[in-house]
Amino acid sequence: MWQLWASLCCLLVLANARSRPSFHPLSDELVNYVNKRNTTWQAGHNFYNVDMSYLKRLCGTFLGGPKPPQRVMFTEDLKLPASFDAREQWPQCPTIKEIRDQGSCGSCWAFGAVEAISDRICIHTNAHVSVEVSAEDLLTCCGSMCGDGCNGGYPAEAWNFWTRKGLVSGGLYESHVGCRPYSIPPCEHHVNGSRPPCTGEGDTPKCSKICEPGYSPTYKQDKHYGYNSYSVSNSEKDIMAEIYKNGPVEGAFSVYSDFLLYKSGVYQHVTGEMMGGHAIRILGWGVENGTPYWLVANSWNTDWGDNGFFKILRGQDHCGIESEVVAGIPRTDQYWEKI
């Protein structure tokens, strides 16, 4: 009897596998399949002529890693709006609107952290301090505690590094903004563009505790520190309250190949292979055509998605988006003379 049962189970598994369509991650067929499903989002081409190794390396977050203690939230009496956009709530903080580019490096774990940290420094100093915190400094100097540099890392450890060691300033590639701007160039997602090709190769840059020529103060003097770091529970309301009170947070989720094709709407996984874990910055929420969403900033340049941003289903821990949220509070005492 058990042999018959085992045979039936095998047949069901095979039938289910065959019923799932299989597409190349960047194919017209996958775009058409998603769009014909009449789901809550629209697919289109964001990448052309790029290596699969590059696409998988974009997803450089190790999910399920160590987490700092949760911060106790008191949200019972907090009245949260139906929609919220940190760009509109704190318009005097320019980094909230910014989209960065991680290039050919699995550094999303570092970008999600420094983007949210930059936003929070501005928010918690009432816009008296506006700084682009350096992804380069975090990526190169956190070492094995944070993971493996361009080969992936842990978002929670990025925030811990900020509180323990501090992070210097640093803008985009060749921006010459701050102490340590990003040293990895953006790569070309399109066929006839001017940027270098996207590959899945490249070593993590070396940690340098010297600011670029012409910048002052010194590396040590330029450090920005966190007062604390913590994880946020996977409660939808707790995450909303954290963003509402303190600013954008870092989150992470499982990326499937259909996500690479996101153009607009509220993303929900339809089909496609698992690419890896990916860290991002969550800056708000809302409802679109009856579908609740998180508003999220990616780090794949402004020519990806909706000018670099995307929306993803909210309230159902879709692809794990609500399970890996981390944040922290800046040490504002270091800015007293500016405030």
UniProtKB/Swiss-Prot annotation:
Q: Which biological process, per GO, is one annotated for this protein? A: regulation of apoptotic process
The Gene Ontology terms for molecular function here are: collagen binding; cysteine-type endopeptidase activity; cysteine-type peptidase activity; peptidase activity; proteoglycan binding
Q: Which Enzyme Commission number(s) are on file for it?
A: 3.4.22.1
The protein's location, in the record's own words, is: Lysosome; Melanosome; Secreted, Extracellular space; Apical cell membrane
A GO CC term attached to the entry: melanosome
Please name the catalytic residues of this protein. C108, H278, N298
- Sugar-bearing residues? N192
Keyword flag Protease: yes
| Chain positions found as N6-acetyllysine | K220
Disulfide bond entries: C93-C122, C105-C150, C141-C207, C142-C146, C179-C211, C187-C198
The free-text tissue note of the record is: Expressed in the stratum spinosum of the epidermis. Weak expression is detected in the stratum granulosum.
- Where does the signal peptide begin and end? 1-17
Q: Which residues form the propeptide?
A: 18-79, 334-339
Principal EC category: hydrolase
Inhibition and activation profile: Inhibited by leupeptin.
Supply the alphabetized keyword list: Acetylation, Cell membrane, Disulfide bond, Glycoprotein, Hydrolase, Lysosome, Membrane, Protease, Secreted, Signal, Thiol protease, Zymogen
The organism's superkingdom is given as Eukaryota
Membrane topology is: Peripheral membrane protein
User: Catalytic activity, per the record?
Assistant: Hydrolysis of proteins with broad specificity for peptide bonds. Preferentially cleaves -Arg-Arg-|-Xaa bonds in small molecule substrates (thus differing from cathepsin L). In addition to being an endopeptidase, shows peptidyl-dipeptidase activity, liberating C-terminal dipeptides
Subunit description: Dimer of a heavy chain and a light chain cross-linked by a disulfide bond. Interacts with SRPX2. Directly interacts with SHKBP1.
State the function annotated in the UniProt record. Thiol protease which is believed to participate in intracellular degradation and turnover of proteins. Cleaves matrix extracellular phosphoglycoprotein MEPE. Involved in the solubilization of cross-linked TG/thyroglobulin in the thyroid follicle lumen. Has also been implicated in tumor invasion and metastasis.
Q: Which disease is it linked to?
A: Keratolytic winter erythema: An autosomal dominant genodermatosis characterized by recurrent episodes of palmoplantar erythema and epidermal peeling presenting seasonal variation. KWE manifests during childhood. Skin lesions may spread to the dorsum of hands and feet and to the interdigital spaces. Lower legs, knees and thighs may also be involved. A less common finding is a slowly migratory, annular erythema that is seen mostly on the extremities. Between flares, the skin can appear unremarkable. Itching can occur, and hyperhidrosis, associated with a pungent odor, is invariably present.
Family assignment? Belongs to the peptidase C1 family.
In its UniProt entry, what is this protein called? Cathepsin B
Q: What's the source species for this entry?
A: Homo sapiens (Human)
What lineage is on file? Eukaryota, Metazoa, Chordata, Craniata, Vertebrata
